[in-house]
C-alpha cells in the first residue's frame, strides 16, 4: 500500500514539473506580447488552470482584447470574441435552428452553432447586453452545454469565458446580478501600465514588425494541467486560512470589527474557487503545494465581486478592497 502511494506521489511530482515548465513558457510567451500587465496575465492563467471564468475590469485601450487573442494562440485554444450590444439576442450567442431543404425536396431543421462554441470566448462589454442575453451566456458558463429547441449541445472542452467591463461608462448598461457575478472565479482589475512598460509599448508596437504570440501548449495539455491542479495536496493550515478568510467576509460573528461594514458576503463557491486558485498559482510557480501567502494574494480578486458594503461603510468612504485588507490581517 505504501509503495503504491509513493508511486502515485512520484507520478504527481513528475507531471507537476513538466506542466509547470509548460505554463511558465506560456506565461513568458504572453508577456512578450502584452507589456506591463504581469499580474493580470498571472491571474488570468490561474483562472484558466482552475477551470473557471474571469471578469476583466478596465478602461478601453489596456490590451484586454489582445490578451484574449494571445492566450488563445499561446494555449492552443480556439478563441472567439462577441461584442455585446443592447440589441444582441441569445440566439446570436448560442446559435439557432434553421429550416433546410435538400436537393430531393425534403425539409429538415439544422442547428447552426453560435460563437459560444469556442474554447476561449471573450464577452466584450458584457454589461451592455440585456439581462436575457447575459443569462443565456452565464447559464452556458455554468452548465457547459446549451439547449436549443429541446436538443442539448455540449460546449467544447476546455471552455472558458473572459468577460470585460468598462468601469467608467454606466449609462445604457445592465449591471450583472450578484448570482451571475458569483459564476466568475475572479474579478481582475486591468490597470494602466507603468512608465517603463509604456515606453516599451511605444517602441515595440509602432515599428515595421509586430511581435506575434507563439504557441506553447495545446488544448489537451491544458486539460491535463487542469486535472493535475485538482490533485495537488493542500496543507491543513492553508485550508483553515481559506475557511477563516471566506467566513470572515460574511456578516456575523466571525467577521469581527469588519462585520458592521459587510451587507452580504461570499458563499461556499468562493471557498471552492480559492482552493483551486491557490493550487494553480503554486503550479505556475513550480511548487507542489500552495502556501498561506497564495491565499492572501488571491483573496481580493476572488472575494471582491462576491461582497457588498453596508450604507454605513459607504458613507465613511470605505471600499471592498479596504475591508478585505482588514480581514487579511487576521490571517497572515
Per-segment meaning from a language model:
Residues 1-13, 17, 253-332:
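C-terminal engagement/docking regions of AAA+ P-loop ATPases
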Residues 12-20, 33, 173, 187-258, ...:
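Conserved C-terminal "switch" segment of AAA+ ATPases
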Residues 43-46, 100-122:
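Conserved alpha-helical scaffold flanking the Walker A/P-loop in AAA+ ATPase domains
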Residues 59, 93, 164:
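P-loop (Walker A) phosphate-binding loop of NTP-binding proteins
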Residues 100-104, 129, 133, 141-232, ...:
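Canonical AAA+ ATPase core
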Amino acid at each position: 500500500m505504501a509503495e503504491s502511494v509513493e508511486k502515485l506521489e512520484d507520478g504527481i511530482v513528475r507531471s507537476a514539473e513538466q506542466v509547470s515548465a509548460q505554463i511558465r513558457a506560456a506565461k513568458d510567451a504572453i508577456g512578450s506580447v502584452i507589456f506591463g500587465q504581469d499580474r493580470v496575465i498571472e491571474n488570468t492563467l490561474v483562472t484558466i488552470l482552475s477551470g473557471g471564468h474571469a471578469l476583466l475590469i478596465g478602461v478601453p485601450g489596456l490590451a484586454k482584447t489582445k490578451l484574449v487573442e494571445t492566450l488563445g494562440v499561446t494555449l492552443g485554444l480556439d478563441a472567439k470574441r462577441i461584442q455585446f450590444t443592447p440589441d444582441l439576442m441569445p440566439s446570436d450567442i448560442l446559435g439557432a435552428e434553421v429550416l433546410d431543404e435538400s436537393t430531393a425536396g425534403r425539409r429538415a431543421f439544422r442547428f447552426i452553432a453560435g460563437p459560444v462554441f469556442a474554447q476561449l470566448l471573450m464577452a466584450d462589454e458584457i454589461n451592455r447586453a440585456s439581462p436575457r442575453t447575459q443569462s443565456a451566456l452565464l447559464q452556458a458558463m455554468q452548465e457547459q452545454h446549451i439547449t436549443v429547441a429541446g436538443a442539448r449541445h455540449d460546449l467544447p472542452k476546455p471552455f472558458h469565458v473572459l468577460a470585460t467591463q468598462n468601469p467608467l461608462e454606466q449609462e445604457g448598461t445592465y449591471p450583472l446580478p450578484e448570482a451571475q457575478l458569483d459564476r466568475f472565479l475572479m474579478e481582475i482589475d486591468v490597470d494602466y501600465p507603468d512608465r517603463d512598460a509604456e515606453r516599451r509599448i511605444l517602441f515595440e508596437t509602432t515599428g515595421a514588425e509586430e511581435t506575434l504570440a507563439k504557441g506553447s501548449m495545446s488544448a489537451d495539455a491544458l486539460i491535463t494541467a487542469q486535472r493535475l491542479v485538482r490533485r495537488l495536496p493542500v496543507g491543513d493550515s492553508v485550508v483553515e486560512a481559506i475557511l477563516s478568510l471566506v467566513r470572515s467576509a460574511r456578516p456575523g460573528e466571525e467577521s469581527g470589527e469588519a462585520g458592521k461594514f459587510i451587507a452580504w458576503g461570499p458563499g461556499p463557491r468562493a471557498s471552492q474557487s480559492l482552493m483551486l486558485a491557490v493550487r494553480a498559482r503554486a503550479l505556475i510557480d513550480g511548487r507542489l503545494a500552495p502556501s498561506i501567502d497564495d491565499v492572501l494574494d488571491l483573496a481580493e480578486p476572488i472575494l471582491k465581486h462576491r461582497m457588498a458594503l453596508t450604507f454605513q461603510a459607504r458613507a465613511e468612504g470605505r471600499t471592498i478592497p479596504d475591508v478585505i485588507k482588514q480581514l487579511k490581517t487576521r490571517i497572515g
